[in-house]
């Protein structure tokens, strides 16, 4: 296969739309890949990508890939995102070349409270900062998770209601200001996630994933289940209600 870059659109598809994000496109932010496609058509294209890779790389002649489950929200669904910090203190995503840092001043897939937070952040005079994770909980609680080159806490002035944590190079969190966790509610069950912990970025889709897993397993209370790479135990919590034993493993 080869990599290609669009030079000119001769006849646009009816499914082609104008990308909402000013950072979308060749040579720009590498985070999103389908903003030029109407969202109603995106699930089908994403399924085609999976089928193509299973055939081309995996060697499957007719892979049984089910239809993609669309998100109820095409925009403003991400509850957290991690930015790289360039030498000027700009918050950046990695570009389409997987190397260049692209400064980002707005991101339309972030939750509104995170977009508001992003607009207020200024790290121009903060030394040694390498990464910044912005995170929101179900109830709107906000957290910044900072990473530095030397694992030392940077000097900050915080004038907004946000907790701040430092994530060390060994992935251990150090609480600096406010809470050390954010909270999420999935299918009526609360989850607390520490700085650096993994949780699904799209809560409605997380609920859909749990439902699909439970439906597919069809547990009757006598089974032993392994939840591998379990994160904070999103699936484990619901599996444990239905199986005899659930073993949760995280790297």
What are these regions (language model features)?
Residues 1-251:
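Accessory RNA-recognition modules of RNA-modification enzymes
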């Amino acid at each position: 296969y080869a990599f290609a870059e669009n030079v000119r659109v001769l006849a646009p598809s009816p499914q082609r739309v104008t990308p909402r994000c000013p950072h979308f496109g060749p040579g720009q932010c590498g985070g999103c890949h389908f903003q030029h496609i109407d969202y109603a058509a995106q699930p089908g294209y994403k399924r085609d990508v999976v089928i193509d890779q299973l055939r081309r790389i995996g060697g499957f002649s007719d892979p049984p890939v089910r239809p993609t489950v669309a998100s109820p929200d095409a925009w403003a669904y991400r509850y957290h995102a991690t930015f790289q910090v360039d030498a000027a203190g700009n918050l950046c995503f990695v570009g389409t070349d997987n190397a260049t840092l692209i400064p980002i001043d707005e991101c339309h897939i972030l939750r509104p409270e995170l977009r508001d937070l992003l607009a207020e952040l200024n790290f121009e005079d903060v030394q040694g900062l390498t990464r910044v994770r912005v995170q929101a909980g179900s109830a709107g609680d906000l957290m910044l998770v900072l990473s530095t080159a030397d694992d030392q806490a940077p000097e900050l002035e915080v004038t907004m209601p946000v907790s701040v944590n430092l994530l060390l190079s060994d992935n251990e969190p150090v609480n600096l200001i406010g809470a050390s966790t954010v909270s999420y509610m999935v299918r009526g069950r609360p989850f607390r996630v520490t700085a650096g912990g993994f949780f699904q970025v799209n809560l409605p889709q997380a609920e859909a994933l749990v439902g699909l897993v439970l439906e597919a397993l069809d547990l009757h209370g006598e089974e032993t289940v392994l939840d591998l790479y379990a994160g904070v135990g999103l699936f484990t919590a619901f599996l444990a209600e239905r199986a005899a034993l659930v073993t949760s493993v995280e790297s």
